[in-house]
């Protein structure tokens, strides 16, 4: 039995029937990680010893005849920008290379309470700034479907670990597409929840009004189970929403007949690879065959999403990253003779090129001479983008689009052209600006690589996104395919 091919709910059934132990599952995952890490490089830090201790506790619970929850004993991975008590948390940056937090992020606490077993911390673009993991301060992660291609970013390690069978599920963060884009590139499920639905306490901030934590899973049911564990109000996060949260599995398997589905004309224009377009059109036809009513809609202001995002996100980043000064924690340059020089050298030596670029962009946008012309104007257009979605959702239940305009690109293809790199998130940025949920599922394949279908919903309507995604998954079976890694 190849345990690494199983989903969380399949492993749960095996545990309940005592056909396998949690320790066996963890050892299988550890062997898989050891065999694949030289090739995939998804992890920054491994925590297998701690995972085995956690698994032993789950086995003892089962042996005592106690009931276990759907995630108990299930191996997971955590993106390395979420604090983990006693485990190094680097943001894949030299400036935090030796930072060990004294507490867990709320999502980590919740998953531990749910009995999930952490196998390690995954690689990312430094401070979550990037779309390929090529900006990691340590190494680039490879796409399990083709190791010469990127896994996407910034949560590339989290997506690759699930696609390769190194983790059953993982957590990522999404500021402009950093869950959905790598999910599309790696052929897994990736959900960016509504802003405020999942606590950001313990997430190392990039852009605080845009950041959101969400899951990567191999199928939609697993995604629902992880959301049940991590969603909910948290008093430690002032932006956490005090609303009623549903059972995210409750609508799975229910029909979508009569649903009104919108296709934004702005998302189906120039720039999309013809083969990707073909896969998406076929996916839309499948949704129609399932009984949904599909019609064109318009999101006119989303054409400004890219410049709006690259004014707001760097502005917030320049403020958030001001704390890395070499004084309180993190890297400190030892070659400085005075305090000001120490600040300058610490940041010059500790940050990578993309992080420096975005700090400079943000500082420029916030400077007194340009604040009104750039930053404030971007905030106003952000409101117009949100209004576009509000108006569309008066007529439609969900909106469908490609997740990305192309399949995963090869290493080095876009490193010398930042704008081309930024354009890989062109279909995902608006969802963050509007604060609404977006889900990417595998729609099929083009050029032998996965293609993502993005499903966008109303605020706090994640359960219905999962419902339509589950219906599509059941109709196509695309989620069941795994890359052949020769192990």
From Swiss-Prot:
What Gene3D superfamilies does this protein's entry cite? Amidase signature (AS) domain
Give the EC number: 6.3.5.7
| Reactions mediated catalytically | L-glutamyl-tRNA(Gln) + L-glutamine + ATP + H2O = L-glutaminyl-tRNA(Gln) + L-glutamate + ADP + phosphate + H(+)
Where in the sequence is the active site?
A: 79, 154, 178
The cross-references to InterPro entries, in alphabetical order and at most eight, read: Amidase, Amidase_CS, Amidase_dom, AS_sf, GatA
GO term, biological process aspect, one: translation
- Superkingdom as given in the UniProt entry: Bacteria
What Pfam families does the record tag this protein with?
A: Amidase (PF01425)
User: Which GO cellular component does the record give, naming just one?
Assistant: glutamyl-tRNA(Gln) amidotransferase complex
Would the keyword Phosphoprotein turn up in this protein's UniProt record? no
Which keywords has UniProt assigned to this entry?
A: ATP-binding, Ligase, Nucleotide-binding, Protein biosynthesis
Disulfide pairs?
Answer: none
GO terms (molecular function) for this protein are: ATP binding; glutaminyl-tRNA synthase (glutamine-hydrolyzing) activity
Subunit structure of this entry? Heterotrimer of A, B and C subunits.
Give the protein family: Belongs to the amidase family. GatA subfamily.
> What is known about what this protein does?
Allows the formation of correctly charged Gln-tRNA(Gln) through the transamidation of misacylated Glu-tRNA(Gln) in organisms which lack glutaminyl-tRNA synthetase. The reaction takes place in the presence of glutamine and ATP through an activated gamma-phospho-Glu-tRNA(Gln).
Q: What is the name of this protein?
A: Glutamyl-tRNA(Gln) amidotransferase subunit A
């Amino acid at each position: 039995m190849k345990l690494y091919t199983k989903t969380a709910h399949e492993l749960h059934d095996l545990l309940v029937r005592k056909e396998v132990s949690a320790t066996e599952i963890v050892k299988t995952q550890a062997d898989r990680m050891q065999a694949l890490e030289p090739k995939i490089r998804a992890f920054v830090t491994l925590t297998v010893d701690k995972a085995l201790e956690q698994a032993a506790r789950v086995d003892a619970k089962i042996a005592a005849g106690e009931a276990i929850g759907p995630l108990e004993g299930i191996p997971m991975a955590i993106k390395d920008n979420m604090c983990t008590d006693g485990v190094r948390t680097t943001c894949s940056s030299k400036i935090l290379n030796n930072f060990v937090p004294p507490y867990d992020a709320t999502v980590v606490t919740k998953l531990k309470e749910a009995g999930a077993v952490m196998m390690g911390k995954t690689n990312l673009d430094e401070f979550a700034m990037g779309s390929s993991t090529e900006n990691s301060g340590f190494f680039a992660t490879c796409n399990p479907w083709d190791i010469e291609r990127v896994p996407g970013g910034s949560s590339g390690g989290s997506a690759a670990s699930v696609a390769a069978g190194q983790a059953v599920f993982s957590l990522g963060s999404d500021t402009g597409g950093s869950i959905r884009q790598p999910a599309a590139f790696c052929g897994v499920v990736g959900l960016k929840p509504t802003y405020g639905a999942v606590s950001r306490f313990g997430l190392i901030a990039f852009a605080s009004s845009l950041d959101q934590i969400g899951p990567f899973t191999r199928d939609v049911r697993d995604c629902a189970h992880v959301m049940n564990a991590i969603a909910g109000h948290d008093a430690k996060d002032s932006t956490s929403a005090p609303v009623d949260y549903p059972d995210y599995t409750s609508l799975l398997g229910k029909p979508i007949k009569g649903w009104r589905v919108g296709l934004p004309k702005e998302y189906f224009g120039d720039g999309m690879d013809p083969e990707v377009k073909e896969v998406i059109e076929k996916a839309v036809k499948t949704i129609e065959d399932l009984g949904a009513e599909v019609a064109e809609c318009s999101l006119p202001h989303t054409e400004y999403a890219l410049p709006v995002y690259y004014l707001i996100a760097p502005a917030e980043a320049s403020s958030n990253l001001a704390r890395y000064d070499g004084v309180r924690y993190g890297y400190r340059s030892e070659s400085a003779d005075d305090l000001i020089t120490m600040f300058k050298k610490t940041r010059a030596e500790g940050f990578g090129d993309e992080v420096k670029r975005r700090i400079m962009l943000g500082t420029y946008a916030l400077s007194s001479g340009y604040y009104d012309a750039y930053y404030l104007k971007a905030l106003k257009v952000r409101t117009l983008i949100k209004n576009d979605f509000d108006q569309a959702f008066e007529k439609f239940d969900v909106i469908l689009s490609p997740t990305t305009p192309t399949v995963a690109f090869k290493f080095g293809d876009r490193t010398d052209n930042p704008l081309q790199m930024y354009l890989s998130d062109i279909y995902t940025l608006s969802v963050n600006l509007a604060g609404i949920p977006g889900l990417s599922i595998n729609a099929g394949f083009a050029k032998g690589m996965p293609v993502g279908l993005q499903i966008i919903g109303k605020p706090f309507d994640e359960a219905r996104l999962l419902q339509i995604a589950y219906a599509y998954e059941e109709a196509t079976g695309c989620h069941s395919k795994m890359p052949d890694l020769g192990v």
